[in-house]
Amino acid sequence: MFSRSILLRSVRKSLGRYYSSQAHPQTYIYNLLSDTKCRSCGIQLQDKFPDKPGYYRLPGQNDSNTDKKAKTSELNKKYEKILQNLDISDRNLLINNFSAPKQDDEKVASVPSLQQITPVEADTRDTTKDQQTHSGHSLSCKRCNDVIYNSKTRSIYDPNRDNLNKSEFPIPKLQQVLSTIPVDAPLVYVFSANDFPMGINKDIFQYRPPQQIYFVMTKSDILIPKTNVAFYNNFKKFLQNYMFKKFNVPRENVFIASGKDRWKMTDLYHFIPNYSYIIGDTNCGKSTLVKSLLINHHVKHWKYEALQQRPDEKQSSSASLKNKDFKKLDRLIDSFSSKNGPGTSHIPGFTRDVVPVDIDGIKELFDVPGFTTNENLQDIFDKLNHKQIARITKGANTSKYGSLKSKFDTVKNGQVLSLNGVGYLQFPGQDSMYQIRNVTKFALHKFKNLEKVDSILQRNEIPKSMSSHFIVNRQQQQQQRNELRGYYKRYIIPPFYGTIDLVIKDIGYINIKPTGKKLTNELMVLYLHPSLEAIIRQPILNYIDSPTPKKSPDGTNRKTITSDISKTPFYSRLIPSTVLSDPSSLVLSPPSSDYNQLNQYLQIDESSESAYNDLLELDETNKYDYWIE
């Protein structure tokens, strides 16, 4: 049975790649080059130049010990010489690797790639392929190994380490990514539930019609309880309607899954076309999703084998695994994940080139580097280590932190809410009160006003009791203080009536609910680090909870919330605001200054009835008039 299974998988794999090459010659070339690429990030491997991209070491090598390296190299040469003098059967017996794929020794011509950094010379790849054969599995470059194993508590961009500087984490633009993909290859656009709808780049429709793109929302475990089928179906219906009405994407081209929890993986396998290229924003969860598909296939195989190893028990479809089987399964998953599939990391720009992933010998996918429109995206990560990035980008669970029953804090009368020191939300200063639900991993802290923030940041050191409220370290606090009124971007929050979500890209959202009677039209202001982006949107919880229509006061059924998507904005961009040069004048500037900037941005005449000012009455009828998507 074992040999027959191996044979069938081999035949399926060969046929699959054959048909792939017939449809997309460029895809076939990516497959050929996969043998000499880093399995984690996709870059071309080389073992001659440690200071250049793609450098790797075989297990046991140590760069710091040149003598040992020389001896190892000499031993490898002798080992190679011995192997060459053996016939094939003796060679296989010596290396004890009968199932290792036989590699072709011919050189493969390079193809255009996303590697916009120092090119790797052709002769640096001479030994890569043979070494992979001897090692028995794919190799990872030194940069990827260092990120995964050696950068937990230090800044991820270390200028003193050649393989951990910004040039080793390139983040291309959308156009660059698409230039490496065959024009007729299927596209699967992945976006995160953590910051929906910020992960959807409208420019994609300039290159492909919406009917030819498949959209997958991942990280849905932070929005929808896994066991709540009603919530899943309700939100899926909303998402399909949203994508259809906003972008004309067919409803059947939209799917919801979770790579982290391997949720809906079997259905996703059938949803994604064969030989698809998986695209999306950097850090949206593409690689995790692809890896989960790969693991899901092998988990099925392992479960089947575990059940078959019980000859004394009656086999049936209802047979279940025992506790010891699950423990063994967990170990198999951990071991398999560390050696197979694309690498996953919270660091933007981790994937550097196309990574072919064979799921089961039939379906093959291509993990593609993430893109971005934010040129300052990497700036904030200069100040953070791997653990901090993992924490803040993990996302928080909506049902736990964002529901009506969740814990909330109260902000009132001009207080400033610090978002772990990388953002400051200034609330209206007159008779106002808001409930705040934090659906992020940011540590929030209330200050009396901006002057209080300045007084803290002016000190040589942040008080120890407050250090946890600032995500950057103490040595960078003075720089941050100087940036608050200059380097930090100032945004006006568009007027809103009722509850909203303030969404921060890659981070999550903060639910803001006004309480009491509205007594002021003063606008909220957000100071945000330029590496971050934000929008406001209608509360996402409205589209997850029960779809049962409510009764209006006259007894008639209200329209369902999904029916208004084409008529009202679901979200709004924030209004860029000019920052005055004098910090004190900024704090004391009258609300009318923000009113004027809002009207100018929306091209509203100051003398018109619709102009935003203290006299305007905001209510249900005009609450979206000042939103702009």
From Swiss-Prot:
It is found in: Mitochondrion. Residues 1-19 form a transit peptide. Residues 52-71 are annotated as: Disordered. Transmembrane segments: none annotated. GO terms for molecular function: GTP binding. Residues 171-374 form the CP-type G domain. It comes from the Eukaryota. One of its GO terms (cellular component) is mitochondrion. Keywords: Mitochondrion, Transit peptide. May be involved in the mitochondrial lipid metabolism. Belongs to the TRAFAC class YlqF/YawG GTPase family. GEP3 subfamily. This is Genetic interactor of prohibitins 3, mitochondrial. It comes from Candida albicans (strain SC5314 / ATCC MYA-2876). The gene is GEP3.
